[in-house]
Amino acid sequence: MSLKERFISYGYLIRLDKPIGTLLLLWPTLWALWLASSGVLDLSILLIFVAGTFLMRSAGCAINDYADRDFDRHVKRTQGRPVTSGKISAKEAVAVASFLALCAFLLIQPLNAFTKQLSVLALLVAFIYPFTKRFFAMPQTVLGIAFGFGIPMAYAAILDFIPLEAWFLFTGNIFWAIAYDTAYAMVDRDDDLRLGLRTSAITFGQYDVVVIAISYGMLFLSHLWVAQLANLSNYFLVGWFAALACAIYHLKLVSTRNRENCFKAFRHNNWLGGFLFLGIVLGLGVH
């Protein structure tokens, strides 16, 4: 394999071709950064968190491919992934994940000690998540914790403590992850059943769409509560209702239980997260 081909394989390993995961990790972090700073955010902190989000998502993808290498070869959608196809060794995947995680940790050195302590917990959860699909009936919950760690870290970096609103935001993000990743798990449900893996789509079975609806409901309720605690103006509702419309559209898609529609609903959650961010920006900036 030439050097160019190897770098291309590394790009696929960390999903440079699929930015949706980075965006789903970034939106909750941006929600928290704007709320914690009351809309007046230091540019250096913003850049640190944006870059850190990219690095940690990339590290998570690498460790995920390492963990799933023996399963991916049995699923048509994942057979071409670099590790399971043999383009990158398992040891290389671990090395890439470790290097990216180290870069992320070095990146946050200008931040306070509390943020650094939280980053260690975030790293542990991110690296544990891929293995939970073997024994935990709801790995999406762990994903929600991993994808939401930017929330307490953002508050810690700006305020040096974590207020009540942050925990409502964090809890809402866990429910959001359950919603969008259950839709994603519905795509591979037949393969996961055959391989003996655990996902929320398998755990809830025929009630999968109901669980997605309830999870979305909890997300939107949490944001309403956060809006009250943060004293956001009613302009927050512009983004909130736009996000709600997205969720209704997603429920229409997943109710078909068609693979393509479920995957479309998963990807479309980027818009939902973006609209909730818009609501926070408007709620803070327009009174």
UniProtKB/Swiss-Prot annotation:
Family statement drawn from the similarity comment of this UniProt entry: Belongs to the UbiA prenyltransferase family.
The keyword Protein biosynthesis belongs to this UniProt entry's keyword annotation: no
Topological type in the membrane: Multi-pass membrane protein
EC top class named in words: transferase
PANTHER family per the UniProt record, alphabetical: 4-HYDROXYBENZOATE POLYPRENYLTRANSFERASE, MITOCHONDRIAL, PRENYLTRANSFERASES
Cofactors demanded by this protein: Mg(2+)
Molecular function terms, GO-annotated: 4-hydroxybenzoate polyprenyltransferase activity
UniProt name for this protein: 4-hydroxybenzoate octaprenyltransferase
Record-level GO cellular component terms: plasma membrane
Taxonomy of the source species: Bacteria, Pseudomonadati, Pseudomonadota, Betaproteobacteria, Burkholderiales
Protein's cellular compartments: Cell inner membrane
Listed EC numbers: 2.5.1.39
Domain of life: Bacteria
Catalytic activity: all-trans-octaprenyl diphosphate + 4-hydroxybenzoate = 4-hydroxy-3-(all-trans-octaprenyl)benzoate + diphosphate
Membrane-crossing residue ranges in chain numbering: 7-27, 30-50, 94-114, 118-138, 142-162, 167-187, 209-229, 235-255, 266-286
Pathway(s) this gene product operates in, as recorded in its UniProt entry: Cofactor biosynthesis; ubiquinone biosynthesis
